[in-house]
Regions:
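Ligand-binding clamshell of periplasmic/extracellular solute-binding protein-like
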Residues: 1, 68-78
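Alpha-to-beta junction loops
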Residues: 11-15, 61-70, 83-86, 173-174
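Well-formed, non-transmembrane alpha-helical positions, independent of function
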Residues: 3, 58-59, 77-78, 102, ...
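Hinge/capping helix and adjacent helix->loop/strand transition within the periplasmic-binding protein
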Residues: 1-55, 115-148
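Conserved functional loop/turn residues at catalytic and ligand-binding sites
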Residues: 63-64, 83, 107, 153, ...
Length: 185
């Protein structure tokens, strides 16, 4: 990680970072926030947007980009075969079976997760909302949920109600700040 950051600081435009999302998406926001935390000017980051993980992997394996950002679950086979090397993981904890530090352990003060949520339309009744939450809580308690977390290298960040609402507000602020810093908002 230190060698990568040193090269990035020396010439941010030369270090190409690929991601499977358009500007504003998680694969774009992550390297921008990483750059800022590592002391690289995010406006100088050379981000290449690909149409999903398959195109990103092709570019990475073909040496068209310096590094890529994606979920571990998308590239398990390539990681296990040694075709792709994980420099760091962006969650709070190391991922079991992956020989890579967290960004924080590597000296970059950043945690970044690509979360998923279940949202309902405005005006949903309290009864329907509680029924949805109950189903999600039941799913969360299953072995299948736990197995999916391990299989995909995901962190269990399950939350509902006010905790999830607070998280969404924090995410809105974080994204707006990053996009504003980049001059995109």
């Amino acid at each position: 990680v230190q060698d990568f950051v040193a090269a990035w600081k020396a010439d941010p435009a030369k270090v190409t970072i690929g991601g499977g999302s358009s500007p504003g998406g998680p694969d774009h926001l992550f390297p921008m926030e990483t750059a800022k935390a590592a002391g690289v000017d995010p406006t100088k980051v050379n981000y290449v947007s690909y149409d999903g993980g398959g195109d990103l992997l092709t570019a990475l394996l073909g040496n068209k980009i310096t590094a890529g950002t994606s979920g571990l679950g998308e590239y398990v086979d390539q990681i296990e075969s040694g075709q792709v090397r994980v420099l760091a993981v962006s969650g709070d904890e190391r991922v079991e079976g992956v020989d890579a530090p967290t960004l924080t352990q590597a000296g970059i003060d950043l945690t970044f997760t690509n979360w998923r949520g279940v949202l309902a339309p405005p005006g949903i009744s309290d009864e329907d909302k509680q029924a949805m939450v109950k189903v999600l809580e039941e799913l969360h308690a299953t072995d299948a949920w736990k197995e999916a977390l391990v299989k995909n290298g995901w962190s269990d960040a399950f939350m509902t109600g006010p905790a999830f609402e607070s998280f969404l507000n924090e995410q809105d602020t974080r994204v707006e700040t990053t996009l504003t810093d980049l001059g995109l908002v």
